[in-house]
C-alpha cells in the first residue's frame, strides 16, 4: 500500500512541477485585435468634450518576439460651442512596429513599445459648415498624416486569447482641430494560427 501511495505522490509531483507552457510570441504567429477606449481624458458623460475611439488591427510576430501591426481606427470627439457640441471624426490607417521589452518567465504578460505611421481623413460637423446659429466653421475636412507612440500590455487569458491594455499618443500634423490626442484603451487579441 505504501508503495502505491509513494508512486501516486511521485506521479502527481511530476505532473505539477514540470508543466509545459504554451508557445507564445513565436515568429510567424498572426493575431487579430480589437480595441476601444477614451481619448483626451476620461469623460463619462456626453455633456463634456467626450471622445472615444475604436480600432482593429492585424499583427505578425517576428524574431525576438517583436511584431508588425497594420490596422484602422475611428476617433470621435465633441467640442463645446455655445449651447451645442460640434463632432469631429478621424478615420485613420496605421502601420507600425512593436518592440517587446519586458515579459514574465511564464510568458503570460508582455510589455511592448510601438511606433506607427498614421494616415487618414478628418471631418468636422459631418461636413456641415453652417451651424444652426448662423456661424460658419472654418475648419475644413482634410487628409491627415502623422504618427503614434504606443505602450501596450498583453495578458494571455488562454493560449489563443489575450487581454490588451494600451496608452498611446497620436500626433497628426495636418489636422485642423488638434495635433495631439492621448488615448487609453482595452481590447482583445485572438491568435489565428
Model-derived regions, located:
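Extracellular loop and loop/strand-boundary signature of outer-membrane beta-barrel proteins
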Residues: 41-44, 79-86, 133-139, 171-175
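Gram-negative (and chloroplast) outer-membrane scaffold detector with strong preference
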Residues: 57-131, 190-193
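Membrane-spanning beta-strand positions in outer-membrane beta-barrel proteins
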Residues: 31, 67, 110-112, 156, ...
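Residues that define the transmembrane beta-barrel architecture of outer-membrane proteins
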Residues: 28-30, 48-54, 87-93, 109, ...
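Short glycine/proline- and aromatic-enriched beta-strand/turn motifs that initiate or cap beta-hairpins
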Residues: 20-70, 189-193
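Predominantly the C-terminal beta-signal and adjacent terminal strand-loop region
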Residues: 75-78, 147-193
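Bacterial N-terminal signal peptides that target proteins for export
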Residues: 1-7
Amino acid at each position: 500500500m505504501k508503495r502505491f501511495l509513494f508512486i501516486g505522490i511521485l506521479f502527481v509531483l511530476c505532473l505539477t512541477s514540470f508543466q509545459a507552457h504554451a508557445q507564445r510570441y513565436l515568429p510567424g504567429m498572426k493575431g487579430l485585435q480589437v480595441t476601444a477606449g477614451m481619448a483626451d481624458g476620461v469623460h463619462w458623460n456626453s455633456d463634456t468634450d467626450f471622445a472615444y475611439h475604436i480600432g482593429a488591427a492585424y499583427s505578425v510576430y517576428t524574431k525576438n518576439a517583436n511584431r508588425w501591426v497594420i490596422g484602422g481606427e475611428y476617433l470621435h470627439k465633441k467640442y463645446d460651442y455655445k449651447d451645442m457640441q460640434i463632432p469631429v471624426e478621424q478615420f485613420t490607417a496605421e502601420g507600425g512596429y512593436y518592440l517587446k521589452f519586458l515579459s514574465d518567465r511564464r510568458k503570460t504578460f508582455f510589455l511592448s513599445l510601438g511606433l506607427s505611421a498614421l494616415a487618414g481623413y478628418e471631418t468636422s460637423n459631418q461636413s456641415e459648415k453652417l451651424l444652426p446659429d448662423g456661424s460658419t466653421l472654418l475648419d475644413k475636412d482634410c487628409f491627415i498624416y502623422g504618427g503614434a507612440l504606443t505602450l501596450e500590455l498583453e495578458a494571455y487569458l488562454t493560449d489563443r486569447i489575450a487581454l490588451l491594455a494600451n496608452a498611446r499618443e497620436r500626433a497628426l500634423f495636418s489636422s485642423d482641430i488638434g495635433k495631439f490626442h492621448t488615448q487609453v484603451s482595452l481590447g482583445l487579441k485572438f491568435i489565428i494560427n
